[in-house]
A protein has these predicted regions:
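A short N-terminal helical cap/helix-turn-helix that marks the beginning
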Residues: 76, 83, 117-127
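AMP-binding/adenylate-forming catalytic core of the ANL superfamily
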Residues: 1-83, 89, 94-99
Length: 127
């Protein structure tokens, strides 16, 4: 069955916690995601939790991952089994035109993101 990653990405980015998302599942048993947390949400969340507002530090923090997982789970609750995002990791930086990860019309460049995050995607399927 084919899944529309754009539909799932669109639903993920409607969540206040998630600014950008790239969903991958080409010829794989399930979908995984590379996510960019919303910086405003992240700063507010970190302040309430008394944690640093730096994604590099927060990405490994269990409470932060759980908060993002809850956003993913909210979306998964509206999706069919094959559309659910099972695992995710965080992008190293937002997707932008300048880093060539987005087109001028603000669409993600899937082929570039797949290359940039090849190791993270592979790790999500291994783990």
């Amino acid at each position: 069955d084919n899944v529309s990653p754009q539909r799932v990405e669109g639903m993920l980015t409607l969540q206040p916690e998630i600014l950008q998302a790239m969903v991958y599942g080409d010829k794989r048993p399930h979908l995984v995601g590379i996510l960019v947390p919303d910086p405003e949400w992240m700063a507010e969340w970190a302040e309430v939790e008394g944690l640093p507002k730096d994604l590099k530090l927060l990405r490994e923090h269990e409470k932060f991952r759980t908060a993002i997982r809850e956003a993913v789970d909210r979306v998964n609750g509206q999706l069919s089994v094959i559309e659910k995002v099972r695992k995710f990791d965080f992008a190293d930086e937002p997707f932008t035109i300048e880093n060539e990860q987005m087109t001028p019309s603000m669409k993600i460049r899937r082929h570039i993101l797949r290359k940039v995050y090849e190791d993270k995607i592979a790790a999500l399927y291994k783990g």
